[in-house]
Regions:
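Membrane-anchoring hydrophobic helices of lipid-metabolizing enzymes
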Residues: 2-177, 182, 219-224, 366
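Residue-level preference for nonpolar/small residues embedded in alpha-helices
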Residues: 104, 182, 217-219, 240, ...
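Short catalytic/ligand-binding loop motif for oxyanion handling, primarily in non-cytosolic enzymes
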Residues: 140-144, 183-185, 207-209, 263-266, ...
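Short, basic, glycine/proline-bearing loop/turn elements
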Residues: 146-150, 224-232, 268-273
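Short amphipathic alpha-helical segments and helix-helix/interface helices
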Residues: 163-164, 187-188, 222-227, 244-245, ...
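Catalytic core of membrane glycerolipid acyltransferases/transacylases, capturing the structured
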Residues: 171-236
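Non-catalytic C-terminal accessory region of glycerolipid acyltransferases
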Residues: 192, 236-376
Length: 376
């Protein structure tokens, strides 16, 4: 019988060359010290501060902490932003909760349970945590835009041929994006293509309920993004439709944040999205139809030390493309709590040759709430 080989022999090292602390045990010891003497006391203090003075907490968080980590090396800044997001996941908080008392965390859990019903509770908890991490990363990137450090960040583009072809032939393009990963920052990166870009924001951040430090963070982000856009700018969607139309007539790229539900009295733009036919606001489609501009979409994600902007293919449904990206990385969709506000199109009769369908939508109240308190 062949003798089994034993483990490889340890090299004949001098006793002083052998670590008296096995690396695994040492790391565990350091993590234990950090958890009990730094992490827990710090979390307790921040939780106490938030309860005692929410205004002071948000001022320190948005007005001091985010600008501070924006000046750090990217790896450090992203790590601290994710840690901030994990803390917010633990508390079930984000800026909408600070501002409106909105129960974003409860709707988020409901969406995860709907879309990942077959997953274990631990796997769903990881998605929940990732959602808050990525919203925190988006706010970190907002601070980085204001600091001007994003100009040196490397960017790669995928699927660019369709975009360049559309601009060469029709001189105008409507792009849909979403509250997913780094896609808002991706709007600024589009300026590198050389075309004027007009992006969409929302005046929800100016409401009186929103802490001043939060409003400043988002307004500074929008202003900083405008410097990337080759003469374009970021405009609030509320009340500025004529300016979007005039800009597109002249020629350029208009970016619409498209993962918003329709207004209560608006006819939805339906698309296959996360397993069902769901209805969205019509703004992007209406602009495209009005000016015969191609309608495409993009997402932006951070991977392997750089950002990647990925475009849909010509002729591909732009919302279905976004759906496919979200499906692969659900935790990066930090507006997933709006899923329940999308009207759902379902069959109201037996299938026929005409394929007629009926609409079963959410209530006008739910849609209005999502619009008024939606992500910026």
């Amino acid at each position: 019988m062949k003798q089994e080989e034993g483990p490889p022999l340890e090299p004949n090292l001098h006793p002083l060359e052998k670590s008296s602390w096995p690396s695994g045990a040492f790391k565990s010891f350091v993590r234990l010290l950090f958890k009990h003497f730094i992490k827990r006391p710090l979390e307790g203090f921040l939780s106490f501060l938030l309860r005692m003075s929410p205004a002071l907490y948000t001022e320190l968080d948005y007005g001091v902490f985010l600008p501070f980590i924006a000046r750090m090396p990217v790896a450090w800044g992203r790590s601290l932003a994710k840690a901030r997001g994990r803390l917010y996941a633990k508390w079930g908080r984000d800026w909408r909760n600070f501002s409106f008392g909105d129960v974003v965390h409860l709707r988020t859990r409901q969406v995860i349970e709907e879309l990942r019903a077959e997953w274990t509770p631990e796997e769903r908890a990881r998605i929940f945590q990732a959602r808050f991490e990525h919203q925190s990363l988006e706010e970190y990137e907002a601070a980085c835009l204001h600091q001007g450090v994003t100009r040196s960040w490397p960017v790669q583009f995928e699927g660019l041929d369709g975009v360049m072809s559309a601009m060469a032939h029709q001189k105008r393009l409507v792009l849909v994006t979403s509250h997913f990963s780094s896609s808002i920052l991706g709007t600024a990166f589009l300026g590198q293509l050389g075309f004027p870009v007009l992006g969409m924001s929302s005046n929800v951040v100016d409401r009186k309920e929103v802490p001043a430090s939060v409003s400043r963070t988002y307004r500074r982000k929008y202003k900083a993004m405008g410097t990337y856009l080759n003469g374009g700018e970021i405009l609030d969607r509320e009340g500025n439709t004529p300016r979007f139309v005039r800009f597109l007539k002249k020629g350029g790229v208009v970016v619409i944040v498209g993962d918003l539900p329709p207004e209560p009295n608006e006819s939805p733009r339906f698309a296959n999205f996360l397993g069902r036919k769901r209805g969205f606001a019509q703004g992007a489609q209406r602009l495209s139809d009005m000016l015969d501009a191609p309608l495409m979409s993009f997402v932006c994600q951070y991977r392997d030390g750089q950002h990647w902007v990925r475009f849909s293919a010509p002729g591909e449904d732009p919302y279905a493309f976004i759906s496919a990206q979200i499906e692969k990385d659900l935790g990066q969709w930090w507006a997933m709590d709006v899923l329940g506000a999308y009207p759902v199109e379902v069959s109201t009769q037996a299938p026929s040759d005409e394929g007629q369908v009926g609409q079963v939508g959410v209530s006008a109240e739910a849609s209005a709430k999502a619009q008024s308190k939606g992500s910026a």
